[in-house]
Regions:
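Conserved catalytic core of nucleotide polymerization and phosphodiester-bond processing enzymes
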Residues: 1-195
C-alpha cells in the first residue's frame, strides 16, 4: 500500500525512497528526524513504520501517540514532519477528499468503485470516517485488485506448467504456497515474474 501511495500521489521523495532499494521505514525515519541513514535507531524506524502506515489510514496525533507510547505533541510533530517529508502525500489526501465530496465515491487503479454517501455528512464523526475511507480505500482496494490479478496469473501458470506446488493462502500482499522442493527455484522465478 505504501508503494501504491507513492504511485498514486506521485510524491517524488517517496518514489525516490522506494527506488533507492533502502529500507523504506528507515529512510523515512532519517528524513523525519534529519539524520544520516546509519544513525537511525530501531526505535526511530519503528516510529516511522507506524507513521508510514498510520498516516495513510488517517491516524490522528492522539492515535499515533497511543500506538507509540509518546506524548500527543510529539506524535503531532511526527505527523507534520512526515507530511513535510512527503508533500505529495498531503496533496493526495486533500485531493482525494475533495474529489470524493464531489463524486461521493472513490475508485481503485483498476476502476472498482467504493461509494461514500456520508462524505458530506453534517455529523463530524461520520464525515471523518468517510474522509479516511476516501484516502485509504483507493490504496487498499488497488492493493487487493493487484494481488488478485497476480493470484489468477499464478494459478493459471501453476496449472498450465504442471506444477505440483499449490497456492494455499493470501495474506495482505503475500501469497503462501505449499512448495514441492524440486520446484522451488522455478516457482520463485515464476512468482516474481507475475507479481
Amino acid at each position: 500500500e505504501l508503494r501504491l501511495m507513492a504511485h498514486i500521489s506521485g510524491d517524488e521523495a517517496m518514489i525516490d525512497a522506494f527506488l533507492s532499494g533502502e529500507d523504506f521505514h528507515r529512510a523515512t525515519a532519517a528524513k523525519i528526524y534529519h539524520l544520516p541513514l546509519p544513525d537511525v535507531t530501531d526505535s526511530q524506524r519503528r516510529a516511522a513504520k507506524t507513521a508510514n502506515f498510520g498516516i495513510i489510514y488517517g491516524i490522528s496525533a492522539f492515535g499515533l501517540s497511543e500506538r507509540l507510547g509518546i506524548p500527543r505533541g510529539e506524535a503531532k510533530e511526527l505527523i507534520e514532519g512526515y507530511l513535510r517529508t512527503y508533500p505529495g502525500v498531503k496533496q493526495y489526501m486533500d485531493d482525494a477528499i475533495e474529489k470524493a465530496r464531489h463524486d461521493e465515491a472513490v475508485s481503485t487503479v483498476m476502476g472498482r468503485r467504493r461509494m461514500l454517501p456520508d462524505i458530506n455528512s453534517r455529523n463530524a464523526v461520520v464525515r471523518g470516517y468517510a474522509e479516511r475511507n476516501a484516502i485509504n480505500a483507493p490504496l487498499q482496494g488497488s492493493a487487493a485488485d493487484i494481488i488478485k490479478k497476480a493470484m489468477i496469473a499464478i494459478a493459471h501458470r501453476l496449472e498450465s506448467e504442471h506444477f505440483e506446488s499449490k497456492m494455499i493462502l493470501q495474506v495482505h500482499d503475500e501469497l503462501v504456497v505449499d512448495v514441492v522442493p524440486s520446484e522451488l527455484e522455478r516457482l520463485k522465478a515464476m512468482v516474481v515474474e507475475e507479481m
